[in-house]
């Protein structure tokens, strides 16, 4: 495992300021319950399970009353910062909130809050391959279905070749200074990048694709939640509540006392 070489050397950013409007319901999807715990508990535990992980920065909405106030997971620090109006803004806020010990050329992971089924083997492979590349890498899955191009009338205009198409997953691994530059330049140009690799692409960089498991899915619909609950039951997965540390303060108080004081607005879309 790569963690034996790079133990405690990687920080992760988890953008969690979105409302998950596609899912519906009163709770943001990252706080939906599965197996008695919020989805994000499984997400953070999956990241913290790798020995290379040093800590996690979670970007939350300014009005987030649901954040449990976790300060550590598996004894690894969890910091919080205020997220922005888009996923990209939240990721940038998280990168800027990293501890001073994280250098400009250090690699940083970015992982979706509502992608709780990350396999340790996939994370290990991403770190091993990505850290050997000057740009970085992302987990991805080859497109296996036949793709159709639709016309304005809903009819099929043609079939798209799929041989070189991949679905972008997370985590994604990039150097801190390149994340800052890429996300800042995209924002200045008015471009809403939907993942960090897109920001790298805009700078003419070519991250590597690292094949990951198909079941590293993002929970965006009730069917996705049911699928994850099935996976929990099938594999007998449970979160050790003692591994998630939180102070005895309410969530709203914790949200006000976040690590950075960036002036932002909460998400108005499904940007996590």
Curated annotation (Swiss-Prot):
PROSITE patterns (alphabetical): ISPD
InterPro entries: IspD, IspD/TarI, IspD/TarI_cytidylyltransf_bact, ISPD_synthase_CS, Nucleotide-diphossugar_trans
Keyword annotations from UniProtKB, A to Z: Isoprene biosynthesis, Nucleotidyltransferase, Transferase
Enzyme Commission (EC) number: 2.7.7.60
Disulfide bonds: none
Site (Transition state stabilizer): 22, 29
Pathway linked to the protein: Isoprenoid biosynthesis; isopentenyl diphosphate biosynthesis via DXP pathway; isopentenyl diphosphate from 1-deoxy-D-xylulose 5-phosphate: step 2/6
GO molecular function, one term: 2-C-methyl-D-erythritol 4-phosphate cytidylyltransferase activity
Site entry: Positions MEP for the nucleophilic attack: 162, 218
Broad enzyme group: transferase
Reaction(s) this enzyme catalyzes, per UniProt: 2-C-methyl-D-erythritol 4-phosphate + CTP + H(+) = 4-CDP-2-C-methyl-D-erythritol + diphosphate
GO BP terms in the entry: isopentenyl diphosphate biosynthetic process, methylerythritol 4-phosphate pathway
Chain's role: Catalyzes the formation of 4-diphosphocytidyl-2-C-methyl-D-erythritol from CTP and 2-C-methyl-D-erythritol 4-phosphate (MEP).
PANTHER family linked to this entry: 2-C-METHYL-D-ERYTHRITOL 4-PHOSPHATE CYTIDYLYLTRANSFERASE, CHLOROPLASTIC
Family membership: Belongs to the IspD/TarI cytidylyltransferase family. IspD subfamily.
Protein's name according to its UniProt entry: 2-C-methyl-D-erythritol 4-phosphate cytidylyltransferase
Gene behind this protein: ispD
